[in-house]
Amino acid sequence: MINEVIAKFIEGGHLAKNAVKIEFKKRNTILGIFVQSPDYEDLKSKNFWRIVSETNINEWKESQDNKLAKIFSGAEFNRLSLPKQVAAQV
């Protein structure tokens, strides 16, 4: 996916708030939160994204520690969507 499409999706209310289902071209699907770190704009311009995976979301919400996040290439994303339980609440 290109960075403009990804940014439009997450900056529409999901950045650092809601978990997003991220489907990859060659990896397993994950749930994660896109986080806004000091280097967010620089990474975004290169189509890289800092994401906290589902296993670390609760800890990240308490600490806001960006060391819990990993950087992923947006070029490997196939689709972004809200998980079913979040989509039902919206």
Task: Give, region by region, the residue ranges found by the protein language model.
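Conserved RNA-binding domains used in RNP assembly and mRNA/RNA metabolism
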Residues: M1-V90
